Amino acid sequence: MARIYATLIGYVFGNFLTAMIVGKLFLKINPTEYGSHNPGTANMGAVFGKKWGILTCLGDLLKSLIALFIVYFVFPGHINIAYAGLGLILGHCFPIWNHFKGGKGVAVSAQVAVFYDWRAGLATLLIALILTAIMQNLTIPPLVFMLLFSVYEFWQNQEAGIVFMVITLIMVYKFWQDIIDFFTGHGKRVDILYSIKKKLGIKSE
């Protein structure tokens, strides 16, 4: 029963879409009507500016952290953290109050991975960041990150690995059109290194 309760707690907190709250409260708009129509960090940052993208990301990380800590202290057994993570992703990607139309779960999955196993989480996140810089793409690296993390955790605990693999599949589903765009050459390129250099005032040769 603990696994079910952990999943439900995660789902309830996952339903709090920071992008929608920020959009309605501060910008007086519906984020799903702009850009990629995705109520997530990337779309908020791309359409309304980095400040709102960062605020959205922080909000999503905070809701995830609260849910994970509740499960951590209430239900013994590390495996329950994985189920809370599954609930968070389900709630974030398929919120019941928004007709099951939510975000893609990148920030949430990163938070869950680091909370569950911070060493493996940070290591796979680093790989994803390097891939992002090399590929100049925001679609494939998050999926590679979650896949690598899932495989590693499967070696440690098969049940946890399967739960994280389900999370990976949910993300693949949410990213499906972006994946198609990437492999057909229509994916949006994001030069992270250029953005960092520009922010620091470093001129490219």
UniProtKB/Swiss-Prot annotation:
Broad class of enzyme this protein falls into: transferase
Presence of keyword Transmembrane: yes
Protein's recorded name: Glycerol-3-phosphate acyltransferase 1
The organism's taxonomic lineage, starting at the top: Bacteria, Bacillati, Bacillota, Bacilli, Lactobacillales
Keywords annotated in UniProt: Cell membrane, Lipid biosynthesis, Lipid metabolism, Membrane, Phospholipid biosynthesis, Phospholipid metabolism, Transferase, Transmembrane, Transmembrane helix
Transmembrane segments: 7-27, 52-74, 78-100, 125-145, 160-180
Family assignment from sequence similarity: Belongs to the PlsY family.
Biochemical pathway: Lipid metabolism; phospholipid metabolism
Predominant subcellular localization, coarse grouping: membrane
Subunit structure: Probably interacts with PlsX.
SMART domains in the record: G3P_acyltransf
GO molecular function: acyl-phosphate glycerol-3-phosphate acyltransferase activity
Species annotation: Lactobacillus acidophilus (strain ATCC 700396 / NCK56 / N2 / NCFM)
EC assignment: 2.3.1.275
Highest taxon, organism lineage: Bacteria
GO cellular component: plasma membrane
Subcellular location: Cell membrane
Function: Catalyzes the transfer of an acyl group from acyl-phosphate (acyl-PO(4)) to glycerol-3-phosphate (G3P) to form lysophosphatidic acid (LPA). This enzyme utilizes acyl-phosphate as fatty acyl donor, but not acyl-CoA or acyl-ACP.
